[in-house]
Amino acid sequence: MTKSELIEKLATRQSQLSAKEVESAIKEMLEQMATTLETGDRIEIRGFGSFSLHYRAPRTGRNPKTGTSVDLEGKYVPHFKPGKELRERVDAVNP
């Protein structure tokens, strides 16, 4: 599901809100989440999961085109850990 599909679905389910209002709310929520992660804080949404930063240590990688070694710096990357309720709901899905 894309962001625009999510906005459309929420606007349909919440008929008292316009698509523009839903879009604004989604954008603001995502902006607040990004800002929180930028400061190094953790985000926890009970029943859904938590977002945090994980550190990736410096390492030696390879350029896939040339095969030469490339030194990669350490960096922080966003990490999502699903909550128990979300894990259980997804586990119940039979493809």
Swiss-Prot record:
Organism encoding this protein: Shewanella frigidimarina (strain NCIMB 400)
Top-level taxon of origin: Bacteria
Family that this chain belongs to: Belongs to the bacterial histone-like protein family.
Coiled-coil stretches: none
Quaternary state and interactors: Heterodimer of an alpha and a beta chain.
Chain spans, region Disordered: 56-76
Protein name stated in the entry: Integration host factor subunit beta
Function statement: This protein is one of the two subunits of integration host factor, a specific DNA-binding protein that functions in genetic recombination as well as in transcriptional and translational control.
Keyword DNA-binding: yes
